Every structure is written in C-alpha cells, then in structure tokens.
Amino acid sequence: MTSVAVGYCGLVSIIVITGAAGVIGTMLRPRLARPDRTLRLLDIAPLTDGVGAGEEYVQASTTDLAAMTAACEGADAVIHLAGVPGEVSWEAILELNIHGTYTAFEAARRAGVPRVIFASSNHAIGFTPRSRFPVPDYTFPAPDTYYGVSKVVAEGLAGLYHHRYGLDTICIRILTCFPEPPDRRALSTWLSPDDAGRLFEACLTAPSPGFRVVFGVSANTRGGFVSLEEARALGYEPQDDAEVYAASILAADPDRDVPDEDYPPLQYLGGRFTFPDLDALLSLASGGSVAQWWLSSSSWWMRSRHTAMQTMSASFWPCATSTP
C-alpha cells in the first residue's frame, strides 16, 4: 500500500503520541495541550492519571502495524516515544525499539501523516569523546549500547521516510529528561520538562523542516556538550538551567572535588553507558545483587551506577510501554 503524505498546512490539530504513559509522554501531555488540539495517546499500558480533556486513549502496541495505522488516521503529526528506554537484551531491543519504530514510520506513511518526531538519544553517539564537545548536530554514529544502536537505526529510518516518501522527520537526541536532574552529570545534560515541551512544540510547528537531527537539552550553565544550532533553527529557545539544583546534588556527591575534566561520567557523551564494565554491572543490577555489588565496591563510579539504576528502576523503566 502506498500513501503520499500531505504537505504542512500550519495547523497541528491531532497529534499521535506513542508511549504516552511513559515518563516523557506524561511530562509532554500538559505542555502540548491546546484548546484546538487533540492528543491521541497510544500505549499498551493504561494511563495512570486517566484521559483528560482534549485527549484520546488508544491501547495498542507499536509493533501492531494495523492498530498503529488506524491510530494515525487523520493525524497531523506523530511523536514516537515508545520503546525500551535503556539497555536490555538484543532480542527486546530488536522487537520493540527497531521493529516498533519501523512500524510507527510505516503507519504514519500509510495514513498520510506528514510529520514524525522521533525521540532519539545521545546514546546514538555515546562514544563521542569530551575532546569533541560541543558535539555537532549531525555527528557520525558512535553508539554505546544495543539501545544506542536502535536509535541509530531509527534515525536511518527517519532519513529514509523523508527522502523516499516525503515525510518531515525530526530526530531529537535527548540527553537527560527527568523532572529534576538526577546526578552531577545531569547538571550538564538536563532537558527540563518545560524545555522538552518547548522543543517538541517547535518541532511540531516549524514549516517544512525536512529531515533533521537536533539535540534536546536545556540552557544549563554547565552545558556546552552539544550544539543547539539545528534546534534553534526550528524555533527552540531553552529557558531552564539545571544549576538551580547544583548545590544539593554536589553536596551529596562523594566525588564533588573531582574536576569535570577528570570525572569519568563526563568523558564521553554517553556517560556511564561507556564504562568498560557496563555488561557486568547491568547483570548484577538486574539479577538482584545490587546490595552485594554496593557493599563490595568502594569506587565512586559503581556508587554512581547504582544511583542511576535506582533512578531508572523507579521512574524510567515504566516508559517501556510498547511490549506486545
């Protein structure tokens, strides 16, 4: 089946958001709401806070092409957030992050949706070293994980669906998007909820963007890791700064006296996901041996990794909502 995407008309009245029950989807919903706009929220998981005014809920998996295509009918844009948001098995990454993303793009094409905004990640280029900061928007892929590989593949799909089928496709390489920065590294990489809303709104409304790759980060005092040139070209102007959280975060950091240039999570864009012992650490964390790992370790980076895993377990993994 072949459908030709319609051109940009300046109005974004119906937006499909996949993975809408997840962390970023939950933060975006109130920030993208408009009186003349419908948010069509698609997720395999229920919405914990219910369906609000101007919202529709579609319970479906992003791996179900028929359901996805039906959900995309009549929409002006798709925001594709669904997928596993961290490092798991290759099989899960392949099914949910790669096949699920293909399904989202193909469903948009079949339904005639003119624009797809994809939530990519800094982990697509995680092994980009500090010496290259600020990282240009179109930096060559250097994934740090299977998860990062899935984002590289998805960015390739975005390029294909623009060049072959004419869709406007924008990939946002999100760095650290939580309600508050969770750790010292995030003082440099945080994308605030309000700035996330501003960035996605700019991507929704910019006329004829074509295929773009942009970074998602706030105006952090300790930033400068990545370029915001392409994001600003779309109309994004960040307003928030993680520095307001710096005092409390650094007070709790046992390595606060280590300068940034020597602090291992700041040596590569992928942070801790570039550490050589990542596989072993993830295995320990997922196997219920975190306490043993913590007690047996005196190194700062293992403690930091434990904190990161706690954060993901508590608030990040629930957005892995495209499991069929």
PLM regions with names:
Residues 174-180, 190-211, 219:
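Alpha-helical substrate-binding/gating segment
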Residues 289, 293-324:
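Low-acidity, Ser/Thr- and Arg-rich intrinsically disordered low-complexity segments
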Residues 213, 221-237, 251-279:
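Conserved C-terminal active-site "lid" loop/helix of NAD(P)H-dependent oxidoreductases
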Residues 63, 92-103, 111, 141, ...:
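Glycine-rich NAD(P)-binding loop of the Rossmann-fold in SDR/ketoreductase-type enzymes
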Residues 15-34:
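N-terminal Rossmann NAD(P)H-binding glycine-rich loop of SDR-like oxidoreductase domains
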Residues 103-142:
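Conserved Rossmann-fold NAD(P)-dependent oxidoreductase catalytic core, especially the SDR/UDP-sugar
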